[in-house]
Amino acid sequence: MAVDDVLKTAAARGRQMGLPYGGALTPAEAHEVWRNAPGAKLVDVRTRAEWDYVGRIPGAVEIEIVTYPGGRPNPGFMAELESKVDKAAPVLFICRSGGRSHNAAMLAAQAGYTAYNVLEGFEGDRDAGGHRNTVGGWRAAGLPWSQS
């Protein structure tokens, strides 16, 4: 599917969900847009601990939206975003399962970015056994990631 078609689908999904930003992408759609839309950035808003111990997406911009430990909002989030990401290009936000990235997309949209949330996040929802990484998410979709 062409990038424009993917973004139209994401925008329609976002309207259906009542989202106050550009739209919502599946992990596979996000990967397609990130790789093929000029200037698009994937911003991983998980914590440093998650990047270090759970895994990273090679080439993603990493900006914590909450700090670890403590889980407090990162007061420098928007300043860091503005220093690393051009407002003229699509910005795709991802976290563990979609909640923090939704908040990041809302903040970015308020600041003038064309923002999208990556549904399911990096790890996806829990399966019947209570484990992540098997039901939805970037990793379960077989998209690029690494672990230290």
Language-model segments: residues:
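Structural scaffold elements adjacent to functional motifs in cytosolic proteins
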Residues: 42-44
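Short, surface-exposed ligand- or partner-binding patches at beta-edge/loop junctions that are enriched
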Residues: 93-94
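Rhodanese-like catalytic fold shared by cysteine-dependent sulfurtransferases
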Residues: 1-39, 48-90, 101-148
